[in-house]
């Protein structure tokens, strides 16, 4: 059993310019389930750690600084997935990304139930810091087709943001 239906996991290293917006976009999500945010800070030195601490008053936020300094994005992601407070669905958000609206997390979790799947990959829009669209624009993962098969992730590097997984599969 999971205490949280979903956990948004943000691995971060030296992203003081973007981490606040990423965190705000998660904490403003409107969902009909309990969720939390796990930020794994890989020993940032640019003020990122202090920026994350600004949100310490929100008990949905778990701020982790791993013992090791060499984890990288994958090691930080794994630390989040294996944290005891990680929810039933682990949703990765990059530290320089924001959700497009307050219902994004709800849509991701709904997709798990509607499609009876273990992984959800969504569409995203490339923008500058003023949220103006820049090339290549909308990334829609049209390469994920029935013709390409369910194991297309093994053939292409198409696991773009947003991406989410059924946590028990990741922990197996």
For each feature predicted by the language model, list its residue ranges.
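A conserved acidic beta->alpha catalytic loop
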Residues: 41-50, 69
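Conserved donor NDP-sugar-binding/catalytic core segment of glycosyltransferases
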Residues: 103-136
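Glycine-rich, basic loop-to-helix element that forms the pyrophosphate-binding segment
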Residues: 67-85
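Conserved short acidic donor-positioning loop in nucleotide-sugar-dependent glycosyltransferases
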Residues: 26, 42-43, 71, 95-96
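Short, flexible, basic/aromatic active-site loop/helix in glycosyltransferases
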Residues: 123, 136-156, 160
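Cell-envelope/extracellular polymer assembly enzymes that use nucleotide-activated donors
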Residues: 5-7, 36
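Short beta-strand-to-loop acidic/aromatic patch adjacent to the donor-nucleotide binding site
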Residues: 87-98
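Short, acidic, metal-binding catalytic loop of nucleotide-sugar glycosyltransferases
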Residues: 24-34
């Amino acid at each position: 059993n999971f205490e949280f239906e979903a956990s948004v996991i943000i691995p971060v290293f030296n992203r003081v310019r973007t981490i606040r917006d990423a965190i705000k976009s998660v904490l403003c999500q409107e969902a009909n389930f309990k969720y939390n945010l796990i930020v794994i800070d890989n020993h940032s030195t640019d003020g990122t750690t202090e920026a994350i601490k600004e949100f310490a008053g929100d008990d949905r936020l778990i701020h982790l600084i791993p013992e090791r300094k060499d984890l990288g994005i994958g090691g930080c992601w794994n630390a989040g997935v294996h944290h005891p407070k990680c929810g039933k669905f682990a949703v990765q958000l990059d530290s320089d990304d924001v959700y497009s609206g307050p219902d994004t997390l709800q849509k991701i979790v709904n997709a798990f139930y509607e499609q009876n799947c273990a992984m959800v990959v969504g569409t995203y829009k490339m923008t500058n810091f003023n949220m103006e669209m820049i090339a290549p624009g909308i990334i829609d993962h049209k390469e994920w087709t029935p013709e390409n098969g369910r194991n297309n992730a093994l053939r292409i590097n198409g696991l773009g943001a947003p991406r989410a997984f059924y946590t028990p599969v990741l922990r197996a």
